[in-house]
Amino acid sequence: MTGKEIRARFLKFFADRGHAVVPSSPLIPHNDPTLLFANAGMNQFKDCFLGLEKRDYVRACSSQKCVRAGGKHNDLENVGRTARHHTFFEMLGNFSFGDYFKKEAIAFAWEFLTKDLGLDKDRLYVTVYTDDDEAADIWHLQEGVPRERIYRFGEKDNFWAMGDTGPCGPCSEIFWDNGPEVGCGSPDCAVGCDCDRYMEIWNNVFMQFNRSADGVLTPLPKPSVDTGMGLERISTVMQGVKSNYDTDLFQGIIGHVEKLSGKRYRHSEKDDVSMRVMADHVRATTFLICDGVLPSNEGRGYVLRRIMRRAARHAKMLGFAEPVICRMVEAVNAMMGDAYPELLEREEYIRKVIRAEEERFAETLDRGLAILNEAVADLKNEGRTVIPGETLFRLYDTFGFPTDLTADIVRSEGFTIDEDGFEACMERQREQAREHWKGSGEEGIAEVHKTLHSRGVRSRFTGYEARTAYSPVTVLLKGGAEVAEATAGDRVEIITDATPFYGESGGQVGDTGTISTGSAHVEVTETLRPFPDLIVHRGTVVEGTIRQGDACDLKVAPGRDATARNHTATHLLQSALRQVLGDHVKQSGSLVGPDRLRFDFTHFAAMTPEEIRRVEEIVNSCIMANDDVHAREMALDEAMEIGATALFGEKYGDTVRVVRVGEVSMELCGGTHVHAAGDIGFFKILSEAGIAAGVRRIEALTGMGALRHVQQLEDERKEIAALIKAEGGDNVERLQRLLTRQKDMQREIETLESRLNAARSADLLADVREVNGVKVLATLAEVDDPKKLRELADTLKDRLGSGVVALGCVKEGKANLLVAVTKDLTGRVKAGDLIRQLSPIIGGSGGGKPELAQAGGTLPDKLGEALGKVCELVP
């Protein structure tokens, strides 16, 4: 039975028993930034189990995409070396949200395995929690499992909890006996042994308690069920093989590697490991990229990069010199495309992302391996077997080697890595970054904000409707402490009951403006929003005395209009980018201010000039269409259902604000916007550049700022035309003629300099001396550039045939010294050794290779002395 058939049978079995078939959630957990990747079937139902969400079904089943390659569940180093470890896998599961419980869950599992799949009952064993007599009795009395085939284990193995507190309960697992031939051979071998004989294939979690902070277990009013069965494992059972990699889920991909490499699987254990690593990792890579992850140096993107680079390294071990992981995507899609059609829709994009990362890593892989091999050799000579943290950090920081990749490489040499030392180096780097950033006490003030918020201090934002408000001062802060009053010159923070000022959040800068009372005037230079319902105005009292409790007039500065233009334009920009580049474009960050907008987005390559122009045309077409901009609040689920764009990893509340621009853009957003797209006026992109692997940044202008930019470009064009004496707008043609002429003149200069060098060398060769059988020329040269000094030395070496050339020159009051040695003499005399002995004489330092070395110094009048020393130093 194939993996596809098992998946289909499982879902049909439970659908026939009243379960809703729920599609797999994306690997990036929606609305749960605490979870790196979906790693279990229950992830998407977490709020259902917690009682925070109600759906229109109380029992469900799914086949969930899962990745375990970071944090608590990190199987990466074992992948390819064992029969069971994977980065990507599918978890089949059935779930009950306060509906059925132990009796039904056990009955469903046993029926599916023994009747639907037809497994031999005599090769099945079950486990229960040590105190769960109820489950043990159900297994024995209801399903007829003999008592001797029911094992009891403690909390470590058979009790599940969502966290230190909250829902929890006992587990009951089902094991398959692979037979004594794959066991450890011990007479005591039984369920619970670490060998491969008894393999867990199904786990039933019975959530029946709530654990309090003091550890007390209280029965839940509506207990639930969470189950999981790995598709890869049950496939080994149904296909009669001992390794997950021998199932059809992997064999098609491994066969593709065989075809591409010309090597056979099962002919070499070393090659087999590499093929298994590549097969597993390309599955994880394909699904992660499809779900919106791109390789980077942090978070989810870094996990993906680690997986991809480990696969690329094993591809190199198999003999691949060109990118190959990208060529394996079609094999993954051939196996998985039916169940996950999004893979087929995005196949070309996935291949491009993988190829770009493979090419990027290839640029540094060989150099990094050379450094690592050198370190291993040195450590072996010293009798050490641990790669130091400093070496790990250099490989990571300079050559892009994740630490687990380094560990994987040196494992065969019997080496381990100093992870603590690496973390210490990383922390030093973080500390240096912190030192370079000079804060202004925000962290201390933030504690004040937390205290105020816990006291119930709140602000009501009225700025969507108005730019002014009249409200009392509820809190006055100075120096991070609450005060009763503040006078002229004081830097203060003011909290009012209501405010039209937008607090910095969602990428939009905070408003500026004024706060006035009958006796005081405050210039607001910054507005913060430490909590969604708390807005803090930061500024300076420029006149009078302001007191807590004073009624005040709040007025937002006109810059808000420009910020609103830029914010709405940012929404249109994201929509246009998705139209031009593809649906893989996701927001990675943004900054919206009154002067410009900045938008960071996921994309694997620099945009072409044509793509940039197309994006500008789309945005400006929307502006000219003058579509209305509407904003309304709705439930998060409703917003997702109507297709509103959300920011990946952002934690949203139950109610969200959706901003819609005609039929072009619809996003979750709490920022301020124009009333109609035409209010933006004009949109112009200033720049597009990469800021990280797989992340691009666009900076743009709108309104009068965009117009002034175009006017400035026009002024510069006219100025250039005047300088180059271009007429009739033929700037480009005129410039091309000037550049061609410049190149011709440069070639003439180089020809003349070559002739001059030949003449100089003829004169200088008269000063050649023979020292111990070696021809030596040491002299000052009439050149004013170290580059020309090198060219002259090359000419002299050629003319000498064999010998040592030492030349000196002065440029801008500094001494320059060069030593060149012909290749036949480097075994006897080295240029680098000579320059190190000569450079102190001219008040400097230098170095180089055996054939060529240079030095610079601050004592040009000592050049003659240094050159006179050369003959003494030639052995």
Curated annotation (Swiss-Prot):
Lineage top rank: taxon: Bacteria
UniProt GO MF annotations: alanine-tRNA ligase activity; aminoacyl-tRNA deacylase activity; ATP binding; tRNA binding; zinc ion binding
Positions of Zn(2+) binding: H567, H571, C669, H673
Enzyme class, UniProt record, top EC level: ligase
CDD domains per UniProt: AlaRS_core
Cofactor-binding details, from the entry: Binds 1 zinc ion per subunit.
Required co-factors: Zn(2+)
Keyword Ribosomal protein included in the entry's annotation: no
Function: Catalyzes the attachment of alanine to tRNA(Ala) in a two-step reaction: alanine is first activated by ATP to form Ala-AMP and then transferred to the acceptor end of tRNA(Ala). Also edits incorrectly charged Ser-tRNA(Ala) and Gly-tRNA(Ala) via its editing domain.
Family recorded in the similarity comment: Belongs to the class-II aminoacyl-tRNA synthetase family.
Free-text comment on this protein's domains from its UniProt entry: Consists of three domains; the N-terminal catalytic domain, the editing domain and the C-terminal C-Ala domain. The editing domain removes incorrectly charged amino acids, while the C-Ala domain, along with tRNA(Ala), serves as a bridge to cooperatively bring together the editing and aminoacylation centers thus stimulating deacylation of misacylated tRNAs.
Protein name: Alanine--tRNA ligase
Lineage of producing organism: Bacteria, Pseudomonadati, Thermodesulfobacteriota, Desulfuromonadia, Geobacterales
Gene name per UniProt: alaS
